[in-house]
């Protein structure tokens, strides 16, 4: 555990092999030409080279590139956002079709400045992808939309293949890590989503290494399961800049393997756990696992 003002040395298992082949450069060019944003770039995701260069997948970030919140773990720009871009859904859908994606992940900055929290644009993006790529599965990753469940219903009525909303950290650390969100609101958001569309898998993720205990991580598992969450992801918190929260601990891959085993024993349909795991990491595999489990239970 890190002491005050002490920076931990990044361990060997977190060193990433950079791959910038033609898939990577082509995808980056496509994003710029269509004036699109990805959370891969904006949040400095450590898996960007694997996903773009090897798997040729990306997580689109809609509603602009400026977030109305300032969570202390997140590298996305914060401030006063620009007006909503009503053409954004079509551009995202065109890119999904051009890339011939099997699975598309759509996330967004928080838009607390908008009455609908951006739900209308979010929903139209899903519908546009359905029209142009009917065989592409779609995962949506919204903010808590300020706890407005009419806005959540707008999104759930489009019937995405997975609803993903991240609880991010343990209950005790939530006020320090994401001051404008609450632990219980995130749980209720996930529960309401499942109530609205019981057959659609729900998913949530946490970052560890912020000073939580193993018991608190297991408490998160229990809380998510109590609110009918199907899929969980657990990854290592990495400090994006010196202005963000410091890493308190780097977990060994064996510790992640143990947490995954506990999560699966507790009843999640799928758990992705590892030092470089992020919310949408191997998302295409997760939707397949959830679908198989639903079919087996039918």
Swiss-Prot record:
[4Fe-4S] cluster 2 binds at residues 67, 71, 74. It is found in: Cytoplasm. Its EC number is 2.8.1.8. Disruption phenotype: Disruption of this gene interrupts lipoate-dependent reactions, which strongly inhibits growth in minimal medium, impairing the generation of branched-chain fatty acids and leading to accumulation of copious amounts of straight-chain saturated fatty acids in B.subtilis membranes. Its cofactor is [4Fe-4S] cluster. The keyword Translocase does not apply. PROSITE patterns: RADICAL_SAM (PS51918). Keywords: 4Fe-4S, Cytoplasm, Iron, Iron-sulfur, Metal-binding, S-adenosyl-L-methionine, Transferase. NCBIfam families: lipA, PRK05481.1, PRK12928.1. HAMAP family: Lipoyl_synth (MF_00206). This is Lipoyl synthase.
């Amino acid at each position: 555990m890190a002491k005050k003002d002490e920076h931990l040395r990044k361990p060997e298992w977190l060193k990433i092999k950079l791959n910038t082949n033609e898939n990577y450069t082509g995808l980056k060019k496509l994003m710029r030409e269509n004036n699109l944003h990805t959370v891969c770039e904006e949040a400095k995701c450590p898996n960007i080279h694997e996903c773009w260069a090897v798997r040729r997948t990306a997580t689109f970030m809609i509603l602009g590139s400026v977030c109305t919140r300032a969570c202390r773990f997140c590298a996305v720009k914060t401030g006063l956002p620009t007006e909503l871009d009503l053409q954004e859904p079509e551009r995202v859908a065109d890119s999904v079709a051009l890339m011939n994606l099997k699975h598309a992940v759509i996330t967004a900055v928080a838009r607390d400045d908008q009455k609908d929290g951006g739900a209308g644009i979010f929903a139209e993006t899903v519908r546009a992808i359905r029209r142009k790529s009917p065989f592409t599965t779609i995962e949506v990753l919204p903010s808590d939309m300020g706890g407005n469940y009419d806005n959540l219903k707008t999104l759930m009525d489009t019937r995405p293949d997975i609803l993903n909303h991240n609880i991010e950290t343990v209950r005790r650390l939530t006020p320090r890590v994401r001051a404008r969100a609450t632990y219980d609101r995130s749980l209720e958001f996930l529960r309401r989503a499942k109530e609205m569309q019981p057959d659609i898998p729900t998913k949530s993720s946490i970052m560890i290494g912020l000073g939580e205990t193993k018991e608190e991580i297991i408490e998160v598992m229990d809380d998510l399961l109590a609110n009918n969450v199907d899929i969980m992801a657990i990854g290592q918190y990495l400090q994006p800049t010196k202005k963000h929260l410091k890493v308190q601990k780097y977990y060994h891959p064996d510790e992640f393997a143990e947490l995954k085993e506990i999560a699966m024993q507790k009843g999640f349909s799928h758990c992705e756990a590892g030092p470089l795991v992020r919310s949408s990491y191997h998302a295409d595999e997760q939707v397949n696992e959830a679908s198989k489990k639903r079919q087996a239970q039918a």
